[in-house]
């Protein structure tokens, strides 16, 4: 344990933000170490798998926010990068938002074009997102946002088919933004945050079911804590998850925690508006829309599966 603690990433004890310093390759001194013993029988590997599945969701949601801003608000890459940079100072403060802001502000030295615009829009996968989705199906746990993030990569990979389909299939004409641009940007941020809450709720619910199935004793607050540094999903948001499980270690779903419930209540009007606008403009938003559908399903006392059962 002492070895892992000494070489692990560290975060500030008050802010929860990752610490840096020292020589390259040397352990960071001070701070709270982002390492812990998860449990026996591969439980640590399982938690890492779910982390990666959540990561798939995070990355796809960010891509959808970018697509909406570029399409409806007609913002260029650099301008969107500035927006992401601002978002990184608030509730969306995270490694992925930070590097996305940097990427969007880069230009290709050969062509002078925005760097992101010369990157081919096809994405592969290493398998952990798929494993998370398959395991969720095996467990009977709803994790649609992670699954949609995986399917988005699958769809992106068939570039030639999409090029051909674009010449044949029809959709709505893209309409320009009608209204205040800054308010629209804030609405996209709110939609991203609400979708993120639902994605993490799915991931942590999957781990909760896994501990029952595999007879583990997972500390979910601690898991969120150690993800704050040295992980792709490291974010200020994780501190809120730790606080939620500190309030109630038996929390069934993050959505029922007071903080996250208040966030969804406050931001959901903008969340719904952005999803509606994207749909009306023919913009694919699989993780945004699946997150909202998950929320709707989870809060609905009587679902139409009574008819399914009757069938």
Regions found by a protein language model. Give the residues of each.
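Short, well-structured alpha-helical segments that form the helix of a local strand-helix-strand
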Residues: 4, 147, 289-292
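Rossmann-fold NAD(P)-binding glycine/threonine-rich loop
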Residues: 1-8
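C-terminal substrate-binding/catalytic lobe of Rossmann-fold NAD(P)-dependent dehydrogenases
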Residues: 10-48, 52, 56-280, 284-285
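Short acidic-hydrophobic sequence patches enriched in Asp/Glu that either
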Residues: 1, 92, 303
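C-terminal amphipathic alpha-helical interaction region
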Residues: 265-266, 270-311
């Amino acid at each position: 344990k002492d070895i892992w603690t000494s070489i692990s990433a560290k975060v500030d004890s008050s802010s929860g933000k990752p610490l840096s310093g020292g020589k390259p390759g040397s352990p960071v001194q001070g701070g709270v170490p982002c390492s812990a013993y998860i449990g026996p029988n591969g439980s640590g590997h399982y938690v890492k798998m779910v982390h990666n599945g959540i990561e798939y969701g995070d990355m796809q949601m960010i891509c959808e926010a970018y697509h909406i801003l570029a399409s409806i608000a007609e913002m260029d890459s650099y301008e969107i990068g500035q927006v992401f940079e601002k978002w990184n100072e608030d509730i969306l403060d995270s490694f992925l938002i930070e590097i996305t802001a940097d990427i969007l502000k880069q230009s290709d030295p050969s062509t002078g074009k925005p760097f992101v615009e010369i990157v081919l829009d096809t994405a592969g996968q290493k398998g952990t997102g798929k494993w998370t989705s398959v395991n969720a199906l095996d467990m009977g746990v709803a994790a649609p946002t992670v699954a949609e993030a995986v399917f988005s990569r699958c769809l992106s990979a068939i570039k030639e088919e999409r090029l051909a389909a674009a010449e044949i299939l029809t959709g709505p004409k893209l309409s320009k933004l009608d209204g205040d641009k800054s308010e629209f940007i804030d609405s996209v941020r709110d939609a991203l945050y609400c979708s993120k809450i639902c994605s993490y709720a799915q991931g942590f619910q999957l781990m909760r079911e896994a501990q029952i199935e595999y007879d583990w004793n997972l500390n979910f607050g601690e898991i969120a804590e150690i993800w704050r540094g040295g992980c792709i999903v490291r974010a200020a948001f994780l501190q809120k998850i730790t606080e939620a499980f500190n309030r109630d270690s038996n929390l069934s779903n993050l959505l029922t925690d007071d903080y996250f419930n208040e966030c969804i209540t406050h931001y959901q009007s903008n969340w719904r508006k952005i999803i509606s606008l994207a749909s009306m403009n023919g913009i694919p938003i699989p993780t945004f829309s699946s997150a909202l559908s998950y929320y709707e399903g989870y809060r609905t006392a009587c679902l139409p599966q009574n008819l399914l059962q009757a069938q």
